[in-house]
């Protein structure tokens, strides 16, 4: 398990491999509170599929796997497995609530193309 504390990492020390915004962490905290299970963590993953080749997935998980990278933010843990990590380095995981609806959004600098809905990408 690799632990990343976003608030403690600086560019001079170790660059933060991805950004987990306050808005995303706060929404995850709200959802965990609604579930009534404080052991839940948000798992973000990449899998094959979608119209561009890869797609993002989000799920709650109680277990931290040996190959997971863990980021703590505002009392919430974000998990990314080692396979997905390589596709998400430098990405920003955010939560948006606007005219297009409410959803988690990933801004991924590694994606060379994305589909119109933003849920799939290619590298």
UniProtKB/Swiss-Prot annotation:
PROSITE patterns: HESB. The keyword Transmembrane does not apply. Its cofactor is iron-sulfur cluster. Keywords: Iron, Iron-sulfur, Metal-binding. Belongs to the HesB/IscA family. Required for insertion of 4Fe-4S clusters. This is Putative iron-sulfur cluster insertion protein ErpA 1. It comes from Burkholderia vietnamiensis (strain G4 / LMG 22486) (Burkholderia cepacia (strain R1808)). The lineage of its organism: Bacteria, Pseudomonadati, Pseudomonadota, Betaproteobacteria, Burkholderiales. The gene is erpA1.
């Amino acid at each position: 398990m690799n632990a990343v504390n976003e608030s403690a990492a600086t560019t001079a020390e170790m660059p933060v491999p991805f950004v987990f915004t306050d808005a995303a962490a706060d929404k995850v905290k709200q959802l965990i509170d609604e579930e009534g299970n404080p052991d839940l963590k948000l798992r973000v993953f990449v899998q094959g599929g979608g119209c561009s080749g890869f797609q993002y997935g989000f799920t709650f998980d109680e277990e931290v796997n040996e190959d997971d990278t863990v980021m703590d933010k505002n009392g919430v843990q974000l998990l990314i497995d080692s396979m997905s990590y390589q596709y998400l380095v430098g990405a920003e995981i955010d939560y948006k609530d606007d005219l297009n609806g409410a959803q988690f959004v990933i801004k991924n600098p590694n994606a060379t193309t994305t589909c119109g809905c933003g849920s799939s990408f290619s590298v």
